[in-house]
C-alpha cells in the first residue's frame, strides 16, 4: 500500500495532535484524593510523569511512524494500538503509585 495521497497520515497526525493536547491539558489538572484535596507533595512528581510520558509518546510515535512508512504498514491501526498500550500502562502505573501512598 502506497502512503502517498493516502488518508492514513492525516489520521495519524490528528491522533497525535489530539493525544498531545489531552496530555497537556491533563498534566495541569492536579490529582484529587478522596478527601477532595490535592496532595501537595505528589503534584510536582505527577506533573513530571505526565510531561515525560508525553515526550516519550511523541518521540516513540514519530520513530514508529517512520518505520511504518518504510515498510508500508497502515499508520492508522498501528498508531492507535501503540497509543492505547502506552496509555493503559501509564494509567495502571499512576493508580498503583497513588494508591500505595
Swiss-Prot record:
The chain crosses the membrane at residues 42-64, 79-98. Disulfide bonds: none annotated. GO terms for cellular component: cytosol; nuclear membrane; nucleus. Keywords: Cytoplasm, Membrane, Nucleus, Signal, Transmembrane, Transmembrane helix. Its main location: cytoplasm. It is a multi-pass membrane protein. It is found in: Cytoplasm; Nucleus membrane. Residues 1-27 form the signal peptide. This is Uncharacterized membrane protein C27F1.10. It comes from Schizosaccharomyces pombe (strain 972 / ATCC 24843).
